[in-house]
Structures are given as structure tokens and as C-alpha cells.
Regions:
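Conserved beta-strand-loop-alpha-helix junction that forms the acyl-donor binding cleft
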Residues: 106-116, 131-134
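Active-site beta-strand termini and strand-to-loop segments that position acidic
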Residues: 53-55, 139-142
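Acetyl-CoA-dependent GNAT
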Residues: 7-73, 77-79, 90-92, 96, ...
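Conserved glycine-rich acetyl-CoA-binding loop
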Residues: 77-91, 98-100, 111-117, 121
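Conserved acetyl-CoA-binding loop of GNAT-fold acetyltransferases
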Residues: 120-129
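Conserved N-terminal entry element of GNAT/NAT acetyltransferase domains
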Residues: 1-11, 143
Length: 143
């Protein structure tokens, strides 16, 4: 099986959004503010993204903001969970963010979700629950 991780480009946005809509948890509702139009600034101005392709089809993606160190997205299509793709697509994003000079990166995710276990297993440290009830995590630049 051919698996490739590469930097995301604008032409990937429709496929990335399809992945975002095909997750088991942290699903977008019909009134969500996250639409295809939400992605370009994160890919071009305030961050960078990566996609993971299996046999040429995007099945996972990750996006991080280089100014704030916020992780905007790490998602894997529900049909491709358990293959290590989340870790694979997250790694270049984490490396890139630290290469931008950040000492700390952070994210939030739904409390009580499987994502918490994923983040803890991939080196993130739980920092608490935010005012919205989401679990917060951070990673510090490796010494």
C-alpha cells in the first residue's frame, strides 16, 4: 500500500473537508462555522497543513498556526483509523512549528473523546479543561 505525507495545497481543501466531515467524534453540525472557505488562511497565511494520501486519496490531514502555536486540526477519515495515520500526518506539522521558533504548541479537543488518548500517546501533555469544557494539551520544544 502506498502512503504519502506531503504539504497541503489549496487544491486539497475539498478532500480535506470531506475527511473533516467523515470523523466519528468532534463532528461538525449543520450550523458549523467551519466550511471549505475556512481552510485557505490556515494553509497560506497563518499556518501550514499536511495531508496523508493512501493510494492517492487524502484520508488524513493536520494544520498548525505558526504565530500562535495552535493546532487547528488533526483528523483521520473514520474508515482509516487505527493505521497510525494521525501520528504520521501530525509529525511534520509539529516539527515545522518548532522550526518556526516556537517553544510551545497547544491544542484543545473534546473532553472524554478518543482524541485525548491519541494526543497523550503521541507526546502531548494534558494541561486542563478550558472554559468551553474542552481538554487542553501542550508540547514543549524538545531540548
Amino acid at each position: 500500500m502506498t502512503v504519502t505525507v506531503r504539504q497541503a495545497i489549496l487544491e486539497d481543501v475539498p478532500a480535506m473537508h470531506r475527511v473533516r466531515l467523515a470523523v466519528r467524534e468532534n463532528r461538525l453540525g449543520p450550523n458549523s462555522r467551519i466550511r471549505e472557505e475556512s481552510y485557505p488562511p490556515y494553509l497560506e497565511a497563518i499556518g501550514r497543513g499536511w495531508v496523508l494520501e493512501e493510494r492517492g486519496v487524502i484520508v488524513a490531514f493536520a494544520i498548525g498556526e505558526h504565530e500562535t502555536g495552535n493546532i487547528w486540526a488533526v483528523f483521520v477519515h473514520r474508515d482509516h483509523e487505527g493505521k497510525g495515520y494521525g501520528k504520521m500526518v501530525q509529525q511534520p506539522m509539529v516539527e515545522w512549528l518548532f522550526a518556526q521558533g516556537l517553544d510551545r504548541i497547544h491544542l484543545s479537543t473534546g473532553a472524554g473523546t478518543r482524541a485525548q488518548g491519541f494526543y497523550e500517546a503521541t507526546g502531548w501533555t494534558f494541561t486542563g479543561i478550558d472554559p468551553h469544557g474542552d481538554a487542553t494539551y501542550e508540547r514543549l520544544r524538545p531540548q
